[in-house]
């Protein structure tokens, strides 16, 4: 399997808080996997807005091995917003595929607080139902960070969010990075070192969850 060596992330603070791409690069390096990352991110930015920016297409045209797209959760709470999200996604996906990139949806984690009346676990289902059909239709891969969070919520008592209860805390961030790793490389997250100062015992739990989602294909709300 040909692994991506340079990766572009397009999204918002769900990508840059705790620097998920940078931590992925660091943990990969420790495993002898050399990758680089570039981020086009801005707080609160929606994919439909990214899709209106010429600079985004100029960066996509450079031909990254992989491009990850990450949405604002608020952008898919109504049918109108969901349609706008998909329209923006499709434009950027088509541009990235034309440039020879493998496209991925970074299916984001839920918020720790309610979103449009949905609790965190149910947000995971909403995000899944938004992106999975489009991914299947457009030949896009998915990194199901939402499913990893759903599994953690369902089966464990793990502090996943930071003080604002919206962005990931260190354990949520590590869970996301482990899920990226297992999804992209098809390798077990248990081979990764811990990070963010997380104790090894806690890291092992998060690694196992990532493997269940990325390697075993578990969908928490169907089990």
Question: What do these predicted regions represent?
Answer:
Residues 32, 100, 139, 177-181, ...:
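Generic helix-packing signal
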Residues 58-170, 182, 189-193:
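Alpha-helical cap/lid subdomain in secreted, periplasmic
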Residues 3-10, 14-91:
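Conserved SGNH/GDSL esterase-like catalytic core that processes O-acyl groups on lipids
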Residues 1-4, 223:
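Basic/polar N-terminal segments that are highly enriched at the extreme N-terminus
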Residues 167, 178-223:
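Conserved catalytic region of serine esterases and O-acyltransferases that act on ester linkages
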């Amino acid at each position: 399997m040909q692994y991506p060596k340079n990766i572009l992330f397009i999204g918002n603070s769900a990508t840059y808080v705790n620097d998920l791409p940078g931590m992925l690069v660091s943990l990969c390096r420790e495993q002898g996997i050399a990758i680089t990352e570039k981020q086009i991110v801005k707080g609160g930015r929606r994919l439909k807005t990214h899709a209106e920016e010429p600079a985004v297409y100029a960066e996509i045209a450079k031909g990254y091995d992989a491009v990850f797209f990450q949405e604002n959760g608020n952008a898919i709470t109504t049918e109108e917003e969901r349609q706008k999200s998909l329209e923006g996604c499709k434009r950027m996906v088509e541009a990235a595929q034309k440039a020879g990139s493998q496209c991925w949806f970074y299916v984001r984690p839920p918020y720790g607080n309610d979103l449009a009346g949905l609790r965190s676990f149910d947000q995971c289902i909403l995000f899944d139902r938004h992106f999975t059909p489009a991914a299947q239709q457009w030949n896009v891969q998915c990194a199901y960070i939402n499913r990893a969070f759903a599994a953690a919520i369902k089966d464990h008592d793990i502090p996943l969010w930071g003080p604002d209860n919206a962005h990931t805390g260190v354990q949520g961030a590590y869970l996301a990075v482990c899920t990226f790793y297992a999804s992209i490389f098809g390798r077990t997250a248990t081979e990764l070192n811990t990070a963010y100062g997380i104790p090894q015992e806690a890291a092992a739990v998060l690694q196992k969850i990532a493997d269940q989602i990325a390697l075993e294909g578990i969908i928490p709300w169907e089990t």
